[in-house]
């Protein structure tokens, strides 16, 4: 199996996996979505809320506000199923504001300087003149399989590597290139060919194939000039996070989690403990 990183930023990574199987790639995708630990606000104590927003809606917004959750930040915090949270192993947030103003995520005061909202400009609630807000909240580590707020990924998808072939026995069809909605194809009448600009951007929608078939049928032909398929064992994988942790860290933790599950299954099949 070969892996090639095509691009990487603070919140997105795109890489190619060659010589792999669909179940394996899909297992990594699922682990990245629901089995990587992340911290999010879970318990909210609203002592005063004079705004027009319902308490439940405000608590929901707080829970979905992404918090810095890299391994350095959440190290030492109990995972789900461990001991109950206490003052010395939990992260407390407080929010005390008075209108008129828009309360943003940056106004949340954390008991741990390493764990704070990823973005400062997420609007939480609007307070009018004289309205007050007083909240205390507890952030806990959890998994995406329990609630979406603990999912580190906003996008976690893969597709099989596209393959575009041309039927040289059929006359060249320049119009099929214009049918591509992503501009993957470009017709070059000077060199009498259709060029593939970026095959990895191909969505395999086959708009070009349908256009070529229509043109062929209008000329009394049976075959399409262009065909779109895919490599069964090559994949383009894309992970985008909400900023709570780097995408590469999400991928590594997902692989570790998958490896641990495989080890447990091996021990069980050999008659050992679960």
UniProtKB/Swiss-Prot annotation:
EC number, as in UniProt: 2.7.7.6
Cofactor(s) needed for function: [3Fe-4S] cluster
InterPro entries, A to Z: DNA-dir_RNA_pol_insert, DNA-dir_RNA_pol_RpoA/D/Rpb3, RBP11-like, RNAP_Rpo3/Rpb3/RPAC1, RNApol_insert_sf, Rpo3/RPB3_RNA_Pol_subunit
Catalyzed reaction equations: RNA(n) + a ribonucleoside 5'-triphosphate = RNA(n+1) + diphosphate
Keywords: 3Fe-4S, Cytoplasm, DNA-directed RNA polymerase, Iron, Iron-sulfur, Metal-binding, Nucleotidyltransferase, Transcription, Transferase
GO CC annotations on file: cytoplasm; DNA-directed RNA polymerase complex
Disulfide bonding pattern of the chain: none
Domain of life: Archaea
EC main group: transferase
Localization terms from the record: Cytoplasm
Positions contributing to [3Fe-4S] cluster binding: 202, 205, 208
Pfam family for this entry, one: RNA_pol_A_bac
Gene Ontology molecular function: any one: DNA binding
Primary localisation category: cytoplasm
Similarity section: Belongs to the archaeal Rpo3/eukaryotic RPB3 RNA polymerase subunit family.
Subunit structure: Part of the RNA polymerase complex.
Function: DNA-dependent RNA polymerase (RNAP) catalyzes the transcription of DNA into RNA using the four ribonucleoside triphosphates as substrates.
Protein name: DNA-directed RNA polymerase subunit Rpo3
Source species taxonomy: Archaea, Methanobacteriati, Methanobacteriota, Methanomada group, Methanobacteria
């Amino acid at each position: 199996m070969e892996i090639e990183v095509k691009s990487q930023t603070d919140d997105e990574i795109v890489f190619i996996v060659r010589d792999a199987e669909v179940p394996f790639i899909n297992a990594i995708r699922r682990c990245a979505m629901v089995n990587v630990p992340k911290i999010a606000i879970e318990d909210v104590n609203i002592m005063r809320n004079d705004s027009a927003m319902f308490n439940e809606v405000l608590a929901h917004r707080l829970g979905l506000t992404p918090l810095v959750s890299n391994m350095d930040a959440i190290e030492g915090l109990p995972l789900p199923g461990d001991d109950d949270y206490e003052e010395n192993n939990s992260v407390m947030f407080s929010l005390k504001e008075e209108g008129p103003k828009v309360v943003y995520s940056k106004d949340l005061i954390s008991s741990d300087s390493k764990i704070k909202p990823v973005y400062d400009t997420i609007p939480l609630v609007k307070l009018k003149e004289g309205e007050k807000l007083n909240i205390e909240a507890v952030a806990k580590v959890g998994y995406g399989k329990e609630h979406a707020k603990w999912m580190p990924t906003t996008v976690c998808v893969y597709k099989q590597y596209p393959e575009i072939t041309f039927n040289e026995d059929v006359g060249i069809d320049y119009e099929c290139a214009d049918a591509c909605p992503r501009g993957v194809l470009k017709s070059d009448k000077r060199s009498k060919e259709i060029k593939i600009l970026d095959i990895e951007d191909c969505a395999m929608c086959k708009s070009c194939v349908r256009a070529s078939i229509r043109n062929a049928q209008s000329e009394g032909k049976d075959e399409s000039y262009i065909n779109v398929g895919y490599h069964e064992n090559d994949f383009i994988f894309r992970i985008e996070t909400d900023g709570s942790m780097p995408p590469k860290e999400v991928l590594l933790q997902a692989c570790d989690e998958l490896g641990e599950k495989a080890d447990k299954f091996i021990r069980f099949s050999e008659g050992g403990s679960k």
